[in-house]
């Protein structure tokens, strides 16, 4: 049994909140750079160039990449041989978010209730997903989620008679309905299977997968590639002004489901699909 003090968790979450909001993962930066080179028309090429300049400026000036610093979504893999001491785990995660958004001078975007809309003033509470896994470590992934793209996401409960084409049509329809609202080029997270809630979780988790990494199961890998081709043929472009680059990647995650259902969820990420991770 290994003891981990909540102080380490607080510090790690604080650092990850700041890092995720100011430095985009290298693979996504590279993908945006490649997309800029592939654009041939003047306007989309200029826009993609401006996005790259913004990424560089955020890093150099130690500023957030985007003014919407998101709702803090935290994926926590907690080893079963870990004993957390000094306090409560979820309280520690939320304290880390509070410190990260306060000390990092990040916008506070969370309201305490959907109807009274009073700001909590420290971007808490976070959305926390915890799994108990083998081992004696804690892996934390912080994924701040802006709501320009979140608001464009959808879920549909298909029946088992739905075909692969039906599922792909749903993803494509979701992207077309979104248009330029999610600040394309987008990263498209897709979840198939599970139940109503788990399907949405899969789509969200898919956004944390590197954009250069395809699904290992051939049928889903082929769907990712075909969907990316179809989405980029829509000419929505960056940021809705036309062009070859509407999406940078389509990431699909799938899970077992009930014999009577086939849930499908699409969680859209903008070109600033942020995440940072650390293992304690």
Where would I find each of the regions flagged by the language model?
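Non-transmembrane, aqueous-exposed alpha-helical and coiled segments at domain scale
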Residues: 1-190, 195-280
């Amino acid at each position: 049994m290994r003891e981990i003090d909540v102080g380490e968790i607080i510090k790690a979450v604080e650092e990850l909140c700041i890092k995720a909001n100011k430095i985009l993962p290298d693979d996504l930066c590279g993908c945006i750079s490649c997309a800029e080179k592939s654009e041939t028309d003047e306007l989309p090429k200029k826009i993609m160039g401006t996005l790259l300049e913004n990424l560089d400026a955020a890093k150099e000036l130690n500023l957030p990449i985007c003014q919407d610093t998101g709702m803090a979504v935290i994926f926590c893999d907690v080893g079963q041989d870990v004993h957390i001491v000094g306090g409560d785990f979820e309280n520690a995660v939320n304290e880390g978010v509070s410190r990260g958004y306060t000390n990092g001078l990040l916008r506070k975007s969370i309201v305490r209730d959907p109807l009274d809309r009073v700001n909590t003033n420290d971007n808490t509470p976070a959305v926390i997903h915890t799994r108990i896994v083998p081992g004696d470590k804690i892996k934390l992934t912080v994924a701040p989620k802006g709501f320009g793209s979140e608001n464009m996401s959808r879920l549909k409960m298909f029946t088992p008679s739905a075909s692969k084409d039906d599922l792909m049509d749903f993803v494509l329809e979701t992207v077309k309905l979104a248009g330029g609202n999610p600040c394309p080029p987008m990263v498209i997270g897709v979840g198939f299977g599970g139940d109503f809630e788990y399907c949405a979780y899969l789509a969200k988790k898919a956004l944390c997968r590197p954009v250069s990494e395809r699904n290992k199961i051939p049928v889903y890998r082929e769907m990712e590639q075909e969907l990316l081709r179809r989405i980029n043929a829509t000419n929505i472009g960056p940021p809705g002004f036309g062009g070859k680059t509407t999406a940078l990647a389509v990431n699909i995650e799938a899970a077992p489901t009930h014999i009577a259902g086939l849930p499908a969820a699409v969680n859209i990420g903008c070109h600033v699909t942020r995440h940072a991770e650390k293992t304690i």
